[in-house]
Curated annotation (Swiss-Prot):
EC numbers: 2.7.4.8
GO CC terms: cytosol
Guanylate kinase-like domain segment(s): 7-185
UniProt name for this protein: Guanylate kinase
Length: 197
C-alpha cells in the first residue's frame, strides 16, 4: 500500500496588477508537484505570450463552440474577452496526483467550488489601491481607458475577497511567495488518500 496526496485545485485571484501571474510563475519553479491550468481565451496574445503555453488563444466562435460542447470546468467574460478552464486537462493532472494552479477571478472560483472538491482559494491584495494604480501605470501595457476599467474592476474583485479561504497582501514579493507556498504545503498535509498499487 502506498500513500499519496490527492490532487488539489489551488486558485489564485487578485485584481490585475497585484503580482498574481508573477507569483504563479515562481510557485511553479519552486514546487515540482504544481501544474498550471492553462486557460482558453478570446483575447489577443500579449507580447511574448505563446499559444498552448500561456493560454490557448481562440476566436469568439471557437470559444462558443467549446461552451456548447461542455468542455469547460468554468468560464466567464472578463472585460471584453472570454476565459475558460479546459475540463479534461485538469482532470488528467488531478488523476496523476498533481496539484493544479489556477489564475482565475471570483466568478470562476464560485463556479469551480460548486462543481469540484479539494479546492483551495487564495486572494492576493495589493498594499493599497493607490499602489495598485501605480503598478498598472508602470506596466505601460494599457491605455488610460483600460486602466480606469481595471481600477473599477479591482474594487469589485476586492469586495469578494471574503469568499476566499485565504487572503494575502502582496507588499513584499518574496515574503508573499513564501506565505502562499506554506499555505499549499499545509493544505496538502490535510488532504491525502492511500492507493493500492
Amino acid at each position: 500500500m502506498k500513500f499519496k496526496n490527492k490532487g488539489l485545485i489551488i486558485i489564485l485571484s487578485s485584481p490585475s496588477g497585484t503580482g498574481k501571474s508573477s507569483l504563479a510563475k515562481e510557485l511553479l519553479k519552486i514546487d515540482n508537484n504544481l501544474r498550471l491550468s492553462i486557460s482558453v481565451t478570446t483575447r489577443k496574445p500579449r507580447l511574448g505570450e505563446v499559444d498552448g503555453i500561456n493560454y490557448y488563444f481562440k476566436s469568439d466562435r471557437e470559444f462558443k463552440t467549446l461552451v456548447k460542447q461542455n468542455k469547460f470546468l468554468e468560464y466567464a467574460k472578463i472585460y471584453n474577452d472570454y476565459y475558460g478552464t479546459p475540463k479534461e486537462y485538469v482532470k488528467m493532472l488531478l488523476k496523476q496526483g498533481f496539484d493544479v494552479l489556477f489564475d482565475i477571478d471570483w466568478q470562476g472560483v464560485r463556479s469551480i467550488k460548486k462543481n469540484t472538491n479539494n479546492v483551495i482559494t487564495i486572494f492576493i491584495l495589493p498594499p493599497s489601491i493607490e499602489i495598485l494604480e501605480q503598478r498598472l501605470r508602470n506596466r505601460a501595457t494599457d491605455n488610460e481607458e483600460t486602466i480606469k476599467l481595471r481600477m473599477q474592476s479591482a474594487q469589485n474583485e476586492i469586495s469578494h475577497a471574503n469568499e476566499y479561504d485565504y487572503v494575502v497582501i502582496n507588499d513584499d514579493f518574496s515574503q508573499t511567495l513564501k506565505k502562499i507556498h506554506e499555505i499549499i504545503v499545509a493544505e496538502r498535509a490535510k488532504n491525502f488518500a492511500y492507493h493500492e498499487y
